[in-house]
Amino acid sequence: MAEFTRGCPLVAHNASFDRGFWFHELEQAGCERDSAHEFACTVLLARRLYPDAPNCKLGTLAQFHALPDMGRAHRALADAQTTAHLLLRMQADLAQRFARELGPLRIEHALLARLQRTAKTALQRCVSDYAGPQLAARSPELATN
C-alpha cells in the first residue's frame, strides 16, 4: 500500500484515528512515511464548514447533505465511499462559497489541510492567503482583482 499511495494525499473521516493505524502499518512494513501523506480530515473540515449540521458523524453528514446511501455504516468500503462523496461536496461548497477568492483554482488538498487547522472565524482569510500566490502564479491580473 505504501508504494501504491506514494505521492498521494490522503483523506479520512476522523483522520486522527486512521492516521495512527496508517503510520503503525508503515512502520511494521519497514516503509518510510511519505511527506505527501498529510491527512485531510472531513470531521475537522465539517466542524468549520457546516455549523448547522446536528453533529459531525459520517452518517449524519451524509443525511444532512442528501449524499448517496453507500450501504451499511462502519464497513470500510461503504465508509470510504461516503467519505469520498462528502469530500466532493465539501470541495463544491468551498468553491461556491469562496468563488471570488479562488477564481479558477480547484479546491486542492493543501488548502483542505490548512482549513482543517483554521479557526471557523478565520476561513475567509485562510482561503485568501492561500489563493493569492496561487492566482498570481497563474495570472497576475487575477491576483489583483
Model region roles, listed by residue range:
Residues 1-49:
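Conserved DEDDh/DEDDy metal-dependent 3′-5′ exonuclease domain
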Residues 21, 81-85:
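Short amphipathic alpha-helical face segments that pack within enzyme cores
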Residues 25-28, 48, 64, 86-93:
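Active-site catalytic microenvironments for nucleophilic, acid-base chemistry
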Residues 29-35, 67-73, 95:
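Short, polar/flexible loop-turn hinges at active-site or ligand-entry regions and domain interfaces
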Residues 36-40, 72-80, 100-104:
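Short, surface-exposed recognition loops or helix-turn segments adjacent to catalytic cores
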Residues 43-81:
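Active-site-proximal helix-loop-helix substrate-binding element of RNase H-like nuclease domains
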Residues 84-145:
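Acidic two-metal-ion nuclease catalytic site recognized across multiple nuclease folds
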